[in-house]
């Protein structure tokens, strides 16, 4: 028998020989050694003294004691620094660095510092002193970080809470700490006020705008106290065994002493982007904020929704590289997400060996452990050994670890023995708040073994915390700790700390006395299920279970008590501490010690299945309704669903066939019985038992009238309201009966009517028997109007108050007509608008035919499809002389809307639509296209019974459309609009309100293709419930919340779901002639909705008991009729599958119909055996036999026609040409009469789609953006005037080459600019002309733009001769001794002193700025060019080409240094290619982008090369070449030169020549600047910089980019594109600043100077130069354009001088002027692809860091006949920017359409100047 350890004793008188044997397979060598040593020490002690006690003999031996002291000899130093001071220093050094990126905004270090200082000073003013507790109650938000630092700076003590915890618990915490102040968010404000009656501060932008004036000038750290390390930093509350949470107090010194070494062990640094995932109720959330900011990292804060539902997406979108979470959470993340992390920190629960091993292959795994009493983490394992059967929690960090006897802490345990972990050191907290007794029991001092020390280690004093955790030392001799388990009743459940005693306390206090209770965590069904908290209960008298001798049955009395208690627990305990089941026991199992046998309980629980547990959560043993409320509700349900419906307490409303319409009817029926419920309650609590509990009693006599004028602003008095609105209506004030605000729907409808007069106006005609009947109907309408205010309502725009509804005393004016046709035309031509009647009534009587018609013309702002039948019912009853009940007035609904918390809705929609900026379906044919639906299709789809029990057909429709649209946009994140009844609001009698309440909301559906259908439907269903309180915000208001919201609300598809009308609904209107004013049935009602379609595609789904009819109204320019027919088929089939396959995966659903699949096979099946036919698709796939389009993520799924997928090609190709697929099931199976086959498919990496005619459209590579599939037609050649002379022929060739047109398109009378020329092409023309011995200068191109004029002034010269005047290196320097200068000032600054210096140049001003933007963070001047190569390249040849590129271009061999306050470019003779190479297996694009993100964090210092190359080779054969370059080495004109040189070097072609930058700099410094001074001095004499400063405080310096595209097709081609935006901005500035003389900046190439071949200079020649416009009286638009264009032309020879030089030498501006206040940028040439032999290189450009904003940027991007203007400014100035952009559009329109308008008589200059805020 092999034993792991045994001792062999051999007697040898007088000695005893002992031999120890250990098996290395089970014990490490160190463990064997420890066992042996311990055994020998005890044996030796017994033999020496047989009189001692066993306890004395068990004392540790010297060798073991010395080992323990060796591990714990030094206690880490106490660090008295405060973390917020460390942060402040980081912010001071690098204020622009990103500190927080959050769903609700971004903050830099400077902004966090500024805001937290402002708030801290405010707190101090409110009386916060050292140690005062300040509560923080936030959902996940960037403002939490600010609030935390603010409290720290003020000296207060943080109390972080999680608002999702029960309010009673939060109230207990607030009372315990004695807080007088709470910092909170807008969303939690109401909760905060309930917890703390006063002192609640909402932290947001508005708050800082308010306090800034009271704190400034200026708020700084000098206004703040110096916080001592001994001051308490935070109090964190954990579970307490007495039922009350216990507060642990941690000081600044405690925290810092642990945080800094812990951060070092984990790997925090400036590159860290840390996920703020943990709940604020747990201290690890503090680490996520403070450790990150103390080390220069970025805190990444997801929304609460993303944190729970889209964690992987949040990690990906925020580029998180470090995350801390429990293993349970980590298990839900995919491998791609885990591998994107640099560090995965695990804690909160045990980490299995398997998880550690699996995750360790993907990322760096770190295991942390630490009770709250010792700050966040007291041990760290950052080197996890994967070859063991256990994991270690690591060694002490910030403290030392000891293991003691769990029952006696005065005795140390032997190494390897299990004992209690105790912590010593500066991280041990101060204790428990207000609980000295508990503190003294677990915070201990000076045990005797510590005071005694041991040989070689003197004793010491020390303070400890007893963790209660059982551990042992790692047998590997490292001193690490292995966690074994808890020694008390404290457990961890899914990372949450649960004190079982606290749970048991609340159970006992709520159950009858005498019941024995034990809470325990079990694992149902053994190891396979999730740990679950349950409660075991033994009654005094119980009934034995028939199936289990230990399990009992609860008595009826106890069941009732449990039911009451279970509901109550949720209000006092967090959700995770409420038991999931209550298990009845015959008796509680006990140990010999009479303690509960918890091991036995866990065994009992684990023997149960999850289903059995669920049964133990159901308390009622009877199914029949028991309570009065249940019986009342069951009766109501039977009335809705029929008497035959089987209803018990567990019946589900939706299982019985309920939907939103039925829910509204139930609300109304309940109200009739004086019971109150809401639609939202029905959705949240769908079972009868749950819903019955929510029912409330209502007072049937409750007043429901809203007094007239009571909904107005208190400052707008009734009399004033009457007078003002009456004037707007053109009536007497006495006729106004009420005034109240409009709904958002009415606002939108009136806005649309203002654009299109007939929009949303309906004409309804009823033919009547005779004129007498018409008169009766007329009287009936008058009677109805008296009781229905909506028929007497007009809408007016009240200045300063917005749109208002005006209810008149007499609202009906009657009209008459002779013939129906004439009246309808006349009526249609009369607009309905503001102040006019919105309902018109007429009777036409045709004497010739005898026909009588009644015409109702009504605006949709007065009715919707629900309310119109109610009005008609009222009219019919009046017609039949019947009384009508008094309805609830429309102003009741308005009152409800005015009482809503709009902040909640704003937060909801902002969070809901964050990131919803993807493609929408259908695509528009071009930018700015205005849709107009002109096509209609419909299909009917039968449905069986849904298997998704709690979801309605409406849910399946939403879900299906998301899946179908996702196929066409290649997205799993889809947005569409849905129009709802709007009657889910909790308004008494809402179902009877006569007025329009429909509302449209953006519906966002995100789906996981690997989720089950039932889960997918449940998520959509739940989303619809959450949306109910926010559905009336209105699209026009939602879109203003954020850029993402604005883009999401550009809805292309709208859906209306029209439910089945029940029999009582069909009879709603009663009998009478007015029935002709409403649709006859469900289908007619659905078609009515289509008349008001404003979408590219509108789907109206009309439901009936057997299925649904879908009608599509659409613009066939966005999707053709044939394709739309297929889309409807896919949609209907998907709805059917969702209803029938609840257990299937979403990915299993078939995306297309069988007929469509047959069509795809017909399109794709060009394969003919032995035919030799080939489909020629391009260079790479010349042997293709068939093409297919498959889902990019799953090649087993064909994409439907029109859907986007990856193009795969069938055929025989070399194996190295592509990724190959074989064995696809669909190809093997074939379809219908086409047999299947075995063939190899090749993935092209290209996205594609089929048109409806089978033609194939390539949309671009998978990694790039989808391109438009539209073609741009070239203009046809026109007849031209004769070009005869050799000089003309030479010039015509030059024009054709430069403009990219044929020579036939150039005529003698043509203008260079009419044919597409601009300033850049003018420069090229001059340069290329010089090469052809034709002399021109740029100014001449502008002045003589006609071909014949230009040919006349162009001079022919002799062939270029080599200049005898060569540039001399170092000649630009102003130094007397070049050698001394180099040796003393240059060479010491170089990274490599052996480099041979061949030239030194003074850096140009913009170069100097770019150098600073490269060496300092953020490195906004560093740019990465990525070349994705779609086939293997000769890597060694490619790298030789890169080396040659550097050798040919001195700018790439330029090293920048600073000396004497100046910056120099040092050209070295040779620079070895700076190169990093990588071999990867994963995603090439993701790795390349991540590599750029990492490289930008590395130091780029002066004296070292900025240029660098990277080669990434993928195992797939694809590769990526990356070039890093600084803006100090290139501009947008020379970069294409460099790239084309690289391509030519690789291809072995003629390399495009380039002039060295040194010769250009020499010319500028020696010639151009001296020549330019007089020009700029004359132009700028008496000028000043035009400064545009909005009055809005600059709270956020975050950049925003807003843009619009404007039509410039009417532009005169004589005016260049460069002139237009510059002139427009000059005019805009003049208006806004009320000036006639404006000066601003413009970006120019710097290459229009008189310097031969300047366009080929390889280096950054670009400049910022002034533009000055002095407006003159009498100027026309064309005068302005000509003036600006002339200034462009005249300044070109002088654009080499920099702004700094202009300011100093040419103006009297302050010398501190470093930048323009506003700058106009022009778009330049971009290279999108290069070829490397057979490899086609797709290019991408990455700027990892954004440039800090210094000015207003106005950027112009010409696109054919349109001009896109983009404004870049600060987020705080968004409103001003929006206004400016609109104004720029108006001005551009003026400039291109009214050239002869006089400026000072137009609205441009003479109207009131807009304010600057």
From Swiss-Prot:
Residue segments, region Condensation 2: 1427-1806
Pfam families in UniProt: AMP-binding, Condensation, PP-binding
Induction profile: Expression is induced during iron deprivation. Also induced in response to reactive nitrogen species.
SMART domains per UniProt: PKS_PP
Pathway(s): Siderophore biosynthesis
Region described as Adenylation: spans on this chain: 89-494
Molecular-function GO term, any one: phosphopantetheine binding
GO cellular component, one term: cytoplasm
InterPro entries tied to this protein: AA_adenyl_dom (IPR010071), ACP-like_sf (IPR036736), AMP-bd_C_sf (IPR045851), AMP-dep_synth/lig_dom (IPR000873), ANL_N_sf (IPR042099), CAT-like_dom_sf (IPR023213), Condensatn (IPR001242), PKS_PP-bd (IPR020806)
Domain Carrier: 624-699, 1282-1358
Entry keyword Repeat: yes
Keyword vocabulary terms for this entry: Ligase, Multifunctional enzyme, Phosphopantetheine, Phosphoprotein, Repeat
Single biological process term from Gene Ontology: amino acid activation for nonribosomal peptide biosynthetic process
Enzyme Commission identifier(s): 6.3.2.-
Residues found modified as O-(pantetheine 4'-phosphoryl)serine: 660, 1319
Region (Condensation 1): 738-1159
PROSITE patterns recorded: CARRIER (PS50075), PHOSPHOPANTETHEINE (PS00012)
Entry note about domains: NRP synthetases are composed of discrete domains (adenylation (A), thiolation (T) or peptidyl carrier protein (PCP) and condensation (C) domains) which when grouped together are referred to as a single module. Each module is responsible for the recognition (via the A domain) and incorporation of a single amino acid into the growing peptide product. Thus, an NRP synthetase is generally composed of one or more modules and can terminate in a thioesterase domain (TE) that releases the newly synthesized peptide from the enzyme.
Entry's family note: Belongs to the NRP synthetase family.
The protein's role, per its UniProt record: Nonribosomal peptide synthetase; part of the gene cluster that mediates the biosynthesis of hydroxamate-containing siderophores that play a critical role in virulence via intracellular iron acquisition during macrophage infection.
Protein name per UniProt: Nonribosomal peptide synthetase 1
Gene expressing this chain: NPS1
């Amino acid at each position: 028998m092999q034993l792991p350890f045994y001792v062999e004793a051999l007697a040898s008188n007088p000695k005893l020989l002992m031999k120890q044997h250990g098996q290395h397979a089970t014990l490490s060598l160190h463990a064997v050694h420890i066992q042996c040593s311990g055994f020998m020490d005890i044996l030796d002690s017994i033999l020496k003294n047989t009189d001692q006690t066993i306890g004395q003999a068990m004392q540790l031996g010297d060798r073991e004691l010395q080992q323990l002291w060796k591990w714990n000899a030094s206690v880490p130093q106490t660090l008295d620094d405060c973390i917020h001071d460390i942060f402040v220093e980081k912010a001071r050094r690098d204020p622009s660095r990103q500190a927080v990126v959050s769903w609700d905004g971004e903050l830099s270090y400077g902004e966090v510092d500024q805001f937290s200082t402002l708030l801290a000073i405010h707190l101090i003013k409110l009386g916060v002193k050292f140690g005062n507790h300040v509560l923080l109650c936030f959902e996940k938000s960037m403002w939490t970080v600010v609030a935390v630092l603010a409290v720290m700076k003020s000296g207060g003590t943080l109390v972080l809470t999680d608002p999702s915890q029960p309010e009673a618990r939060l109230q207990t915490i607030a009372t315990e700490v004695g807080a007088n102040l709470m910092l909170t968010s807008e969303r939690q404000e109401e909760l905060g006020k309930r917890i703390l009656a006063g002192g609640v501060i909402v932290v947001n932008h508005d708050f800082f705008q308010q306090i800034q004036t009271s704190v400034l000038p200026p708020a700084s750290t000098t206004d703040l106290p110096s916080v001592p390390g001994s001051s308490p930093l935070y109090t964190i509350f954990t579970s307490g065994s007495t039922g009350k949470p216990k507060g642990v107090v941690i000081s600044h010194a405690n925290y810092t002493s642990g945080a800094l070494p812990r951060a070092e062990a984990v790997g925090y640094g400036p590159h860290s982007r840390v996920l703020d995932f943990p709940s604020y109720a747990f201290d690890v959330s503090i680490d996520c904020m403070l450790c990150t900011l103390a080390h220069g990292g970025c805190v990444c804060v997801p929304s609460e929704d993303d944190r729970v539902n889209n964690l992987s997406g949040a990690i990906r979108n925020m580029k998180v590289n470090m995350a801390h979470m429990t293993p349970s959470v980590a298990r839900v993340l995919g491998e791609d997400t885990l591998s994107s992390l640099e560090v995965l920190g695990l804690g909160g629960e045990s980490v299995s060996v398997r998880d550690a091993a699996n995750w360790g292959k993907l990322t760096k795994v770190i295991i942390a452990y630490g009770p709250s009493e010792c700050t966040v983490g007291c041990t760290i394992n950052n080197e996890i050994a994967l070859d063991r059967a256990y994991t270690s929690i690591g060694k002490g960090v910030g403290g030392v670890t000891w293991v003691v006897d769990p029952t006696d802490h005065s005795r140390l345990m032997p190494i390897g023995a299990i004992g209690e972990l105790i912590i010593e050191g500066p991280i041990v907290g101060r204790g428990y708040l207000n609980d000295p007794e508990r503190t003294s029991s677990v915070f201990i001092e000076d045990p005797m073994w510590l005071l005694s020390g041991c040989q070689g280690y003197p004793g010491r004093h020390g303070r400890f915390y007893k963790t209660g955790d059982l551990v042992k030392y790692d047998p590997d001799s490292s001193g690490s700790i292995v966690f074994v388990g808890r020694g008390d009743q404290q457990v961890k459940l899914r990372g949450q700390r649960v004190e079982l005693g606290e749970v048991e306390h609340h159970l006992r206090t709520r159950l009858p006395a005498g019941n024995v209770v034990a809470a325990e965590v079990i694992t149902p069904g053994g190891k396979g299920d999730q740990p679950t908290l349950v409660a075991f209960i033994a009654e005094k008298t119980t009934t034995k279970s028939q199936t289990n001798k230990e399990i009992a049955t609860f008595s009826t009395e106890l069941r009732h008590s449990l039911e009451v208690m279970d509901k109550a627990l949720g209000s006092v305990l967090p959700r995770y501490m409420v038991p999931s089941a209550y298990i009845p026991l015959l008796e509680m199992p006990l140990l010999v010690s009479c303690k509960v046998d918890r091991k036995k309980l866990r065994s009992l629980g684990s023997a149960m299945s999850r289903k059995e547990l669920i049964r133990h959560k159901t308390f009622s043993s009877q199914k029949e309704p028991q309570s009065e409320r249940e019986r009342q509700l069951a009766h109501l349900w039977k009335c809705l669903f029929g008497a035959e419906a089987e209803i018990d307490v567990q019946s589900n409303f939706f299982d019985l066939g309920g939907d939103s319409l039925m829910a509204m009817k139930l609300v109304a029926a309940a109200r009739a019985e004086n019971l109150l419920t809401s639609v939202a309650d029905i959705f949240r609590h769908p079972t009868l038992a749950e819903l019955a509990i929510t029912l409330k009693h209502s007072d049937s006599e409750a007043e429901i009238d809203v007094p007239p004028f009571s909904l107005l602003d208190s400052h707008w008095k009734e009399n004033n309201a009457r007078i003002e609105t009456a004037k707007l209506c053109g009536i007497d004030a006495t006729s106004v009966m009420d005034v109240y605000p409009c709904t958002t729907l009415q606002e939108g409808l009136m806005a649309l009517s203002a654009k299109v007069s007939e929009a949303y106006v309906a004409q309804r005609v009823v033919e009547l028997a005779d004129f007498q009947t018409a008169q009766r109907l007329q009287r009936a309408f008058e009677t109805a109007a008296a009781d229905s205010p909506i028929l007497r309502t007009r809408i007016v725009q009240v200045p300063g108050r917005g749109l208002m509804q005006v209810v008149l005393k007499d609202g009906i004016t009657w009209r008459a007509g002779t013939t129906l046709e004439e009246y309808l035309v006349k009526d249609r031509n009369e607009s309905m608008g503001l102040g006019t009647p919105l309902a018109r009534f007429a009777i036409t009587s045709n004497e010739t035919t005898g026909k009588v018609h009644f015409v109702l013309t009504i605006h949709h702002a007065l009715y919707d499809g629900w309310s119109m039948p109610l009005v008609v019912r009222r009219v019919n009853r009046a017609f039949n002389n019947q009384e009508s009940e008094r309805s609830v007035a429309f102003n009741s609904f308005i009152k409800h809307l005015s009482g809503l918390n709009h902040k909640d809705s704003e937060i909801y929609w902002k969070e809901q639509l964050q990131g919803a900026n993807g493609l929408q379906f259908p695509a528009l044919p071009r930018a700015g296209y205005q849709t107009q639906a002109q096509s209609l299709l419909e299909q009917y789809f039968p449905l069986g019974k849904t298997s998704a029990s709690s979801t309605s057909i409406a849910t399946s429709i939403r879900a299906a459309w998301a899946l179908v649209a996702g196929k066409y946009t290649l997205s799993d994140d889809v947005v569409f609009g849905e129009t709802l009844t709007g009657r889910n609001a909790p308004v008494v009698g809402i179902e009877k309100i006569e007025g329009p309440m429909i509302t449209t909301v953006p519906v966002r559906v995100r789906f996981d293709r690997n989720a089950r259908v039932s889960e997918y439907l449940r998520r959509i269903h739940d989303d619809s419930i959450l949306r109910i309180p926010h559905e009336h915000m209105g699209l026009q208001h939602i879109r203003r919340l954020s850029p993402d919201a604005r883009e999401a609300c550009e809805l292309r598809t709208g859906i209306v779901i029209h439910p089945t009308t029940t029999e009582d609904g069909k009879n709603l209107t009663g009998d009478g002639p007015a029935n002709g004013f409403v649709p006859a049935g469900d289908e007619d009602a659905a078609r009515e909705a289509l008349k008001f379609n404003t979408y590219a595609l509108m789907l109206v789904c009309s439901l009936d008991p057997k299925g649904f009819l879908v009608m599509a109204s659409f613009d066939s320019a966005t999707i053709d009729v044939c394709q739309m027919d297929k889309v409807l088929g896919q949609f209907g089939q998907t709805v059917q599958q969702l209803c029938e396959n609840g257990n299937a995966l979403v990915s299993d659903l078939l995306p297309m119909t069988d007929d469509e699949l047959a069509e795809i096979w017909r399109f794709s099946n060009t394969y003919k055996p032995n035919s030799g036919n080939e489909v020629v698709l391009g260079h790479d796939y010349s042997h293709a036999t068939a093409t297919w389009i498959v889902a990019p993520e799953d090649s087993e799924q064909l994409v439907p026609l029109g859907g986007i997928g990856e193009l795969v090609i069938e055929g025989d190709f070399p194996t190295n040409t592509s990724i190959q697929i074989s064995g696809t099931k669909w190809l093997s199976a074939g379809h219908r009469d086409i047999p299947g086959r075995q063939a190899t498919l090749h993935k092209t990496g290209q996205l594609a789609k089929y048109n409806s005619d089978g033609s194939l459209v390539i949309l671009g590579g998978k990694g790039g953006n989808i391109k438009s599939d539209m073609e741009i037609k070239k203009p046809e050649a026109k007849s031209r005037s004769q070009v005869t002379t050799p000089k003309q022929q030479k010039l015509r060739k030059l024009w054709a080459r430069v403009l990219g047109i044929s020579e036939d398109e150039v005529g003698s009378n043509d203008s260079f600019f009419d044919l597409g020329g601009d300033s850049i092409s003018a420069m090229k023309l001059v340069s290329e002309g010089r090469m052809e011995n034709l002399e021109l200068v740029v100014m001449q191109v502008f002045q003589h733009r006609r071909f014949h004029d230009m040919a006349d002034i162009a001079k022919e010269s002799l062939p270029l001769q080599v200049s005898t005047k060569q540039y001399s290196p170092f000649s630009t320097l102003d130094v007397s001794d070049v050698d001394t200068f180099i040796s003393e000032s240059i060479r010491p600054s170089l990274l490599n002193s052996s480099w041979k210096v061949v030239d030194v140049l003074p850096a140009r001003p913009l170069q100097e700025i770019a150098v600073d933007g490269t060496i300092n963070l953020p490195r906004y001047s560093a740019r990465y060019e990525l070349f994705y190569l779609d086939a293997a390249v000769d890597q060694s040849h490619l790298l030789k080409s890169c080396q040659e590129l550097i050798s040919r271009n001195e700018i790439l061999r330029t090293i920048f240094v600073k000396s004497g306050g100046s910056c120099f470019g040092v050209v070295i003779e040779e620079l070895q290619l700076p190169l990093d190479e990588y071999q990867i297996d994963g995603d090439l694009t993701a790795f390349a982008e991540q590599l750029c993100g990492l490289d930008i964090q590395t130091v780029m210092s002066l004296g070292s090369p900025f240029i660098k190359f990277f080669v990434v080779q993928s195992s797939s054969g694809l590769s990526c070449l990356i070039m890093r370059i600084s803006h100090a080495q290139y501009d947008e004109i020379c970069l294409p030169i460099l790239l084309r040189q690289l391509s030519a070097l690789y291809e072995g072609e003629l390399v495009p020549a380039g002039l060295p930058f040194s010769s250009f700099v020499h010319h500028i410094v020696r010639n151009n600047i001296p020549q330019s001074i007089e020009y700029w001095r004359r132009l700028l004499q008496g000028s000043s910089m035009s400064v545009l400063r909005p009055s809005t405080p600059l709270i956020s310096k975050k950049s925003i980019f807003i843009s619009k595209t404007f039509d410039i097709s009417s532009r005169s081609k004589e005016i260049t594109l460069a002139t237009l935006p510059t002139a427009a901005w000059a005019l805009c500035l003049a208006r806004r600043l009320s000036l006639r003389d404006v000066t601003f900046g413009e970006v120019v190439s710097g290459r229009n100077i008189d310097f031969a071949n300047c366009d080929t200079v390889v280096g950054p020649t670009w400049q910022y130069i002034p533009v000055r416009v002095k407006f003159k009286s009498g100027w026309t638009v064309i005068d302005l354009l000509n003036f600006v264009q002339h200034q462009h032309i005249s300044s070109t020879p002088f654009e080499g001088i920099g702004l700094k030089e202009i300011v100093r030498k040419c103006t009297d501006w302050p010398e501190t002027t470093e930048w323009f206040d506003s700058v106009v940028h022009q778009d330049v040439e971009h290279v999108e692809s290069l070829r490397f032999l057979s490899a086609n290189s797709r290019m991408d450009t990455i700027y990892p860091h954004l440039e800090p904003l210094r000015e207003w940027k106005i950027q112009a991007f010409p696109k054919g006949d349109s001009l896109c203007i983009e404004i870049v400014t600060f987020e705080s100035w968004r409103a001003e920017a929006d206004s400016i952009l609109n104004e720029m559009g108006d001005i551009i329109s003026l400039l291109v359409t009214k050239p002869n308008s006089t400026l000072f008589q137009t609205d441009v200059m003479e109207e009131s100047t807009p304010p600057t805020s």
